[in-house]
């Protein structure tokens, strides 16, 4: 299974030669460094550890600095393991060219944190009646109507209650690759990806759609030529 680390740049839109607008997410994918090789003989599974995005060496402990020194690279901020991704050696680089337009990928990131929220925003519950006493008293408009059966004498685990919304691990599956820009280390995906701008993302080959489709032909303004998706 192929995989790489990236950072969300933002969203935009592209047009096909038929004039159809496609909402796209732009992801910065620098060269990833293989910082560890995990073998089945030693660790009971096969994987490689990838690292990306430099960080000041003064912010790392000496054991961490030594770990990156084995791969002959500077300390990195973002580190992840990818199972069953073989064929690479310690210190080797992995870039965006491992993917091609038409392939599908799964993108994992941390969703935007929205702070403390009520049940209506957090769980899409219905708002109470705005008349006949619904504005106050025993059942205010934006309050949960019931917390459970009277015979339970307790609130059962998992009841929808107010609390923190967002800032959790989210995976969007089967996003189509529209364009691969090797020169600028960019990956353009159809649709949205989790998280705010500048947030880190893990990009892997899609589990549910392993077969690629024909690349989309993009329109270029002031030109009669189509964009070559390479």
Swiss-Prot record:
It holds the Pfam family Ribosomal_L3. One of its GO terms (biological process) is translation. The keyword NAD does not apply. Gene3D superfamilies: 3.30.160.810, Translation factors (2.40.30.10). GO terms for molecular function: rRNA binding; structural constituent of ribosome. GO terms for cellular component: cytosolic large ribosomal subunit. Keywords: Ribonucleoprotein, Ribosomal protein, RNA-binding, rRNA-binding. Residues 125-149, 210-230 are annotated as: Disordered. It comes from the Bacteria. Part of the 50S ribosomal subunit. Forms a cluster with proteins L14 and L19. One of the primary rRNA binding proteins, it binds directly near the 3'-end of the 23S rRNA, where it nucleates assembly of the 50S subunit. HAMAP family: Ribosomal_uL3_B. Belongs to the universal ribosomal protein uL3 family. This is Large ribosomal subunit protein uL3. It comes from Mesomycoplasma hyopneumoniae (strain 7448) (Mycoplasma hyopneumoniae). The gene is rplC.
